[in-house]
A protein has these predicted regions:
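Structural motif
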Residues: 4-11, 54-64, 72, 120-129
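Blade-level signature of beta-propeller repeat domains, shared across WD40, Kelch, NHL, RCC1
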Residues: 123-168
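Surface-exposed loop and turn segments in beta-propeller and other repeat-based domains
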Residues: 19-29, 69-93, 144-158
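Residue-level signature of beta-propeller blades and closely related beta-rich strand-turn architectures
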Residues: 1, 49-52, 66, 116-117, ...
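Surface beta-strand/loop "capping" patches
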Residues: 86, 90, 97, 156-185
Length: 185
């Protein structure tokens, strides 16, 4: 595969075992998934759909691997929710409004850095918003001199469940399994 379309999401257990694809390992779309965070009480993640050779901004979307793990099968743009075509564009998501650093509060509500003007203003100037998946939004914070990025609520969040490690720390070798070297696009 080429150097451009290799920006899928991987997952693993806390002890480093079980490394596997979460989404898009054999996909051209989305080109890159940035700032991905798990949505509480679901198997979905919210992320910025972007390009490879771009800045770390793009379109706001949700990845649901239960609907599929390649191309646009489990990927949908939100704010507002809409059909999401699988586009092969290196600089994906760089036109119009721009999103960065989403933080899920629920399956439908997010804190996110956002600029409605996109690159029309240079440099792009981000403000902190509350967003609903349907596109409703409310400005929470802005600064006349700097962009607002990486919002994190100052309240406790439930600790995700962690499976017990199966590693034996006395061992110095391990095993590797390749399921099917011929599978893929």
């Amino acid at each position: 595969r080429g150097q451009v379309f290799v920006q899928g999401l991987f997952q693993m257990h806390a002890d480093g075992t079980g490394q596997t694809e979460f989404y898009g390992n054999n996909s051209w779309f989305p080109t890159a998934l940035l700032h991905a965070r798990g949505i509480p009480k679901s198997q979905e993640v919210v992320a910025v759909f972007s390009g490879h050779h771009t800045l770390q901004v793009g379109k706001l979307g949700i990845i649901n691997p239960a609907r599929g793990r390649q191309e646009n099968q489990g990927a949908r743009l939100i704010a507002p929710v809409r059909e999401t075509a699988a586009e092969r564009i290196d600089a994906y998501g760089q036109e119009g409004e721009l999103f960065a650093y989403p933080y899920p509060l629920s399956a439908a509500e997010f804190l996110v850095s956002y600029t409605p003007d996109g690159w029309a203003v240079d440099p792009a100037f981000f403000k902190l918003y509350w967003f609903h998946a349907d596109g409703r939004r409310e400005l929470l914070a802005s600064d006349p001199d700097i962009s607002c990025h990486q919002a994190i609520p100052l309240v406790p969040r439930a600790t995700p469940p962690e499976r017990q490690s199966t590693l034996d720390p006395t061992q110095h070798t391990g095993g590797f399994a390749l399921q099917d070297g011929y599978a893929g696009p």
